[in-house]
């Protein structure tokens, strides 16, 4: 597959992106220059990354250029089915994508994968390639409960799978971060179950990617505080989004994602807690509210590009403000 044909998986190539920016004028993106030649020593202790899922409609080069011009420190790159890099092409495509991201002056502190355990398709090829490129972390997860058997028994069955993944991570010197989700049958939604899976593991190789919004969905009054305290010793990455409760078309109460600062998540308290814990690691911005399909990782979007850019710029500014107020900026 040629590079051009492979890039046509996305809705916009670099040439088309630059034409769009030129036609839209300087208002399309803020005038932030690319910081060429970023080194590990110059990266912030909490690099603020765009989750590349929301830029699936851009090819690697315009995606990286957009992230840099908007002011992000880095990229959390999707290396999974439907992502910027497909698992079956990781050895060919991830080095190219990583090079483009780094040439744009961005950090690549992590990738998001579909890996659940060592038996996941292409798991070892992904880890081998990620390690060779000097990417230190990857997002892992996806365990779910079934109706068969007790929850303690199911957790006991998961522990050997986590231990096996730990050994593969040790081999490649990588840290897997389990992403926390809310919802029925999600392992990790209650947080205490995830603690039982990671508490005896080496945090160099097995850790947590804590999503404070999902934690607030599950326990909005005080439980999110308890789960933060419980898992912070194992937390190597954090994901940020916001929500409020609303009735859906059937009259049922559901979490409704919204721009940062317009929902229920207490970011000021959360970042103060992370400051107290001396947290360092990648922070990933997730934008799950309606953005013409960008929120779902679609490869074409139904809104103007500027709508997505404005949303990312607004949420990023709020993150920067909160981090600075907490002494983390």
List the model feature ranges, each with a label.
Residues 51-55, 78-82, 113-116, 143-145, ...:
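Active-site beta-loop-alpha junctions enriched in small/polar residues
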Residues 70-72, 76-81, 106:
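Short, conserved active-site loops that position catalytic residues or coordinate cofactors/metal ions
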Residues 82-86, 146-150, 217-218, 293-294:
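A short acidic, helix-capping loop that chelates divalent metal ions and anchors anionic groups
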Residues 2-12, 16-47, 58-70, 191-329:
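Histidine-acidic metal/acid-base catalytic patches
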Residues 16, 21-31, 62-64, 81, ...:
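Active-site acidic/histidine proton-transfer and metal-coordination neighborhood
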Residues 46-52, 75-77, 108-113, 138-140, ...:
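Hydrophobic faces of well-ordered beta-strands that scaffold small-molecule active sites
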Residues 78-96:
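Glycine-rich, proline-tolerant flexible connector loops at the mouths of alpha/beta enzymes
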């Amino acid at each position: 597959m040629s590079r051009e044909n492979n890039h046509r998986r996305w809705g916009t190539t670099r040439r088309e992106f630059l034409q769009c920016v030129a036609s839209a004028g300087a208002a399309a993106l803020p005038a932030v220059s690319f910081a060429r030649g970023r080194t590990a020593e110059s990266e912030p202790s909490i690099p603020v990354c765009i989750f590349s899922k929301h830029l699936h409609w851009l090819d690697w080069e315009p995606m990286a250029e957009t992230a840099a011009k908007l002011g992000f420190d880095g990229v959390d790159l999707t290396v999974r089915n439907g992502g910027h890099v497909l698992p079956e092409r990781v050895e060919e495509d991830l080095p190219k994508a990583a090079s483009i991201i780094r040439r744009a002056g961005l950090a690549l502190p992590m990738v998001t994968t579909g890996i659940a355990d060592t038996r996941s398709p292409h798991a070892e090829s992904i880890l081998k390639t990620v390690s060779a490129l000097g990417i230190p972390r990857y997002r892992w997860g996806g365990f779910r409960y079934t109706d068969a058997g007790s929850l303690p028994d199911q957790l006991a069955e998961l522990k050997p799978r986590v231990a096996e993944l730990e050994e593969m991570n040790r081999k490649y010197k990588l840290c897997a971060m389990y992403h926390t989700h809310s919802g029925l049958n999600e392992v990790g939604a209650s947080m205490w179950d995830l603690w039982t899976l990671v508490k005896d593991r080496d945090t160099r190789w097995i850790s947590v990617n804590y999503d404070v919004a999902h934690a607030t969905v599950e326990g909005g009054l005080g439980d999110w505080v308890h789960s933060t305290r419980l898992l912070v010793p194992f937390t190597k990455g954090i994901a940020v989004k916001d929500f409020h409760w609303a009735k859906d078309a059937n009259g049922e109460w559901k979490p409704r994602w919204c721009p940062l600062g317009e929902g229920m998540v207490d970011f000021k308290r959360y970042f103060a807690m992370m400051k107290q814990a001396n947290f360092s690691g990648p922070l990933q911005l997730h934008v799950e509210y309606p953005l013409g399909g960008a929120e779902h990782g679609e490869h074409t979007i139904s809104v103007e590009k500027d709508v997505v850019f404005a949303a990312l710029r607004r949420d990023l500014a709020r993150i920067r403000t909160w981090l600075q107020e907490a002494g983390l900026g």
